[in-house]
Amino acid sequence: MAKYNTKVLGFGDNVVDLYEHSHMMYPGGNCVNLCAYSKMFGVERAAYMGYFGSDDIAEFVISVLNELEIETVKCKQLVGENGWSKCTLRDGDRIFGDYNEGGVRGKTPYILDRFDLDYMKEVDFVHTGNYCYTESQLKVMKEAGIKISFDFSDDSTEEYYKQIAPDATYAFCSFDGTDEEAEDHLKKITSMGPKLAMASRGAKGCILYDGQEFFAQK
């Protein structure tokens, strides 16, 4: 039974992290992770929408999503490589190496139709990010009344923020700086349109800004 009456949808990236030092692979990607952790926390409904390749890596990700009972009814499977990235551990830190830029997902633009948008309207918000290749569809989603959660990671340029933030309802980023610098960054983000902005800062914890007050993780 669900703990939370919340419905979420991840739209965009699915990848597999290939750990070269251990010869293990793990499913991931911002949107897949959102679905997986939401399901583990007990949301009522978690769905993933995106493109899979036609290789063994794609089948592995699909099998994990099915095992977690995450909806994939709006996904498509295309001929070609699934997204992957190679990584290893060095002094306890994860170091990323080669990656294939999303595989078929990076080569195939999303074009949402009215049925896709109707499906998205069934959830409380749709999560995507700056590695999802979904930028061209954000305005269409916003105009349809869909709440958008967007992860800018730690490498989005100011120009990218100006382009994307106005369409986002909730904005997330990774930020390495002082408390004051983080707060200034979140203020700037919300001034562009999002109702909420949150910065994750590793061991320093997260800071959330709702346009009026700051909330810090202790």
What is each of the regions a protein language model found here?
Residues 2-6, 183-218:
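Conserved phosphate-binding/catalytic region of the ribokinase-like
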Residues 8-10, 148, 171, 197:
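Residue-level marker for buried hydrophobic side chains located in beta-strands
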Residues 124-188, 203-206:
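Conserved beta-alpha-beta core of the PfkB/ribokinase-like small-molecule kinase fold
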Residues 39, 66, 142, 191:
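Anion (oxyanion) recognition and catalysis
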Residues 1-23:
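Positively charged, low-complexity intrinsically disordered leader regions
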Residues 24-40:
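Short catalytic helix/loop segments, enriched in acidic residues and glycine
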Residues 43-44, 143-147, 192-196:
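A short helix->loop->beta-strand "cap" motif at the edges of active sites that frequently abuts
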Residues 16-21, 25, 44-124:
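Conserved N-terminal subdomain of the carbohydrate kinase-like
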